[in-house]
Structure formats: structure tokens, C-alpha cells
């Protein structure tokens, strides 16, 4: 992302957003580190943007970013295997406590496909439709995350621009969550957590 793109992003952000998240899910973040430092400069026009700034690295990279002090909020992609949530949150927690910043998952989700609970980030995974796989994964994520007071929320992947009908959704093995059984789990979680530190 060059200076022209950053300025355009700045113009849109000032008008439209309360939080700006730079995402690329990249492992080599030297360019983004420079971008974050530029964003934090008080003498630049960018300071017209008064919202929060975050960066969303790919999963497993949270403790490899050396410039979290340049952003307001630490974020990450939450595509962890169903049986590894606790250990990954333990690892992420060390970074969150070190930098003393809020944290959220800027992207998290799982397909409704057999086997996707173990490799939720692999959208190319072939397998049969299994709606319960998605439900199990979300239950595991929410159960592990609700015990972490430093975790402030999730951007769930995915909400399609065109919502499917219930009959379409129940045949859909993608990350889509609308009109699927997992929607009930998500609703219950947020109803229960309303007013707590997670919200």
C-alpha cells in the first residue's frame, strides 16, 4: 500500500469509520509497520482521523508483530482448530498483556463442511456438508473466549451481502452463518454476553 492508497483510505475513514483495521494476513509486515508508524505521527494530516487503528495479522502471527505500540487495538484472524483455542488464547494473551491494549478477532469463522473444525482457515477443504461442524466450532470458540476479559469481540466471517433463504442456507457448506443453525448459537452467545466485558 503506497502513500496515495493510504491517503484515500484516510479520506474514507475520517468520514465513515470509528475503527480502521489494516489487513493483509501477511507474515512479512515491514511495510505495514511503516504504515502504522506513519498513521501514528501527530504532524500528519492522518490525525484528522480520530477513530481507532488496528492491524489484523494472519493467525499465529500475533506474537511476531513488534510494533503493536503503533496501533490502538490488537487484532487477529481467529481461525484456530476447534481443540486448540485455549492454547492459542494463552499465547495471544501474553502479547495483549505485554502491550496493554484491547484485543478483538477482526475475522473468525468456520465452514459447514466435514473436517473444517480442525482447519477452519482452509476454504479449499473438500468435504461433505455438515452444519453441525460449524456449530461445534463456534461453541468451542465462544466457550474459550468468554473466559478472557481482555478479548473485546469478533467480526464473524461471513455475512454475505445477499442473505440466503433458509432453504438455501441449509444446503450451503461455506462460511456463511445467516439462516443456518449456527445463527442460533451466535445469537445466544451475544444475548448472554450483553453488558459484559466482551461487548
For the regions a language model picked out, list residue spans one by one.
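Alpha-helical elements of Rossmann-like donor-binding domains used by nucleotide-donor carbohydrate transfer enzymes
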Residues: 33-37, 140, 185
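Aromatic-rich peripheral "rim/lid" segments of glycoside hydrolase catalytic domains that contact
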Residues: 66, 115, 120-123, 132-137, ...
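Short beta-strand/loop segments at the ligand-binding rim of alpha/beta enzyme cores
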Residues: 47-54
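Nudix hydrolase/Nudix homology domain
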Residues: 2-44
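Conserved active-site loop/cleft motifs that coordinate metal ions or position small ligands
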Residues: 20, 29-32, 103-107, 152-158
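The substrate-binding groove and active-site-proximal loops of carbohydrate-active enzymes
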Residues: 45, 77-84, 124-133, 172-176
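Glycoside hydrolase catalytic-domain groove-lining segments
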Residues: 54, 58-122, 142-151, 177
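Generic hydrophobic alpha-helical scaffold/packing signal
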Residues: 18, 93, 135, 139-143
Amino acid at each position: 500500500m503506497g502513500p496515495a492508497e493510504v491517503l484515500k483510505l484516510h479520506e474514507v475513514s475520517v468520514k465513515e469509520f470509528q475503527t480502521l483495521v489494516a489487513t493483509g494476513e501477511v507474515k512479512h509486515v515491514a511495510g505495514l509497520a511503516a504504515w502504522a508508524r506513519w498513521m501514528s505521527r501527530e504532524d500528519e494530516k492522518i490525525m484528522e482521523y480520530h477513530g481507532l487503528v488496528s492491524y489484523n495479522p494472519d493467525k499465529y502471527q500475533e506474537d511476531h508483530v513488534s510494533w503493536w505500540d503503533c496501533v490502538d487495538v490488537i487484532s487477529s484472524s481467529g481461525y484456530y482448530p476447534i481443540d486448540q483455542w485455549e492454547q492459542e488464547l494463552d499465547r495471544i494473551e501474553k502479547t495483549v498483556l505485554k502491550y496493554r491494549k484491547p484485543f478483538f478477532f477482526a475475522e473468525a469463522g468456520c465452514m459447514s463442511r466435514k473436517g473444517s473444525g480442525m482447519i477452519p482457515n482452509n476454504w479449499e477443504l473438500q468435504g461433505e456438508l455438515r452444519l453441525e461442524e460449524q456449530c461445534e466450532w463456534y461453541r468451542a470458540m465462544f466457550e474459550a473466549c468468554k473466559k478472557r476479559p481482555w478479548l473485546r469481540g469478533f467480526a464473524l466471517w461471513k455475512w454475505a451481502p445477499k442473505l440466503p433463504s433458509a432453504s438455501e442456507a441449509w444446503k450451503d457448506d461455506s462460511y456463511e452463518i445467516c439462516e443456518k443453525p449456527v445463527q442460533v448459537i451466535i445469537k445466544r452467545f451475544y444475548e448472554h454476553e450483553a453488558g459484559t466485558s466482551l461487548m
